[in-house]
Amino acid sequence: MSMTDPIADMLTRIRNAGMAKHQKVDIPSSNLKVSLANLLRNEGFIKNYKVIADNKQGVLRVYLKYIDEKDPVINEIKRISKPGGRVYVDSDGIPKVKNGLGVAVLSTSKGIITDKTARELGVGGELLCTVW
């Protein structure tokens, strides 16, 4: 079955696994998803991730992070730019998520970066999702 929005699928799997208190979640892998998982790890939203080869596209295993072993660190993870309605922002139009407590994730010419990094570099791009 073809998937129209693999990033939304990844975010939904992470959100559902967090609500179900799972320690890890397996997601079909791609370069974009690995970049997004790397950014989430660097920002402290997930413990870690690893790519497992399975002679097809591979599996991205994401290890979730919890506060006091019960509440997920990710309170909300939301897809912004969708296949049916892409959302592009310039460096001046990058939104602050929860007054700077959260992170907006952008796909730019410099790669997958956070809103803070995009402002520092003065670049805009496609607003993939917000996390807090």
Swiss-Prot record:
A GO molecular function term, named singly, is: structural constituent of ribosome
Protein name, entry field: Small ribosomal subunit protein uS8
Q: What does this protein do?
A: One of the primary rRNA binding proteins, it binds directly to 16S rRNA central domain where it helps coordinate assembly of the platform of the 30S subunit.
GO BP: any one term: translation
To which protein family does this belong?
Belongs to the universal ribosomal protein uS8 family.
Cysteine disulfide links: none
Q: Could you give the subunit structure recorded for this chain?
A: Part of the 30S ribosomal subunit. Contacts proteins S5 and S12.
- Ribonucleoprotein listed as a keyword: yes
A GO term from the CC aspect? ribonucleoprotein complex
Query: Which key words are in the record?
Result: Ribonucleoprotein, Ribosomal protein, RNA-binding, rRNA-binding
Can you tell which superkingdom this protein's organism belongs to?
Answer: Bacteria
Q: What is the native source organism of this protein?
A: Geotalea uraniireducens (strain Rf4)
